Amino acid sequence: MRIEKIGNATLYLGDCRDILPTLPKVDAVITDPPYGIGFPYEGYDDSLENLDALIAGFMPWCLANAERVVVTPGISNVQRYPQAAWIGAWTWETTATFGKLGYSQWQPILFYGSDLPGFGNVNGIIKSDRIHFQGGAAKIDKSAGEVHTCPKPLEFMVRLIGRFTRSGETVVDPFAGSGTTGVACHNTGRAFIGIEREPKYFDIACRRIDDAQRQGQLLPAEPAGEAQQTGLALGP
């Protein structure tokens, strides 16, 4: 098992099901797991059977050892996860034709835990959490090389971490990918523990987080455009 320590970030190369049991209790888990989309990519067979095995392998540890757990499961997988305390959504508006063609323009967010600081003012979440993306697409930082196949936008992860964790807390991402959650933790003053099974993306994550810590905040400037992404809190 390879371990890299970069400032207040620690990254593990390996399977989260093997590594999570070796970690201490943490403040939060914030992660974007595989979606079970049904075909192999990046050396992993993303079948529903493998997704179910992953959920059974990582979620019990998260719920038992983290004060808060935030998961973006994919629109078709909510029922595969344990019942959440809250279900939220991130949505986007765009002038593109995706909506007209029947593609979803929202994704669910599952929130677990009784200590959820972001839900202190539900109306505030609905009205104020707006992140703008040019053309409705995620603005991905490619300065450190190739990024992950399915990354979340840095701005989105910064908003999620800032809303549902507190400064100085520790965030674990069992599916770290190219390190977006780790960069967002740096930008918001959180410690980070990331786990990634693919060596290529592990190396990219290490470089991106190292660059973020060397250069200070890497938050990209607010891009112009009509599209907007809105954080929306829904009831349990």
Where are these regions (language model features)?
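Conserved SAM/SAH-binding loop
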Residues: G14-D18, P223-L232
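Generic signature of intrinsically disordered, low-complexity, basic-rich segments
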Residues: R130-Q134, P220-P223, Q229
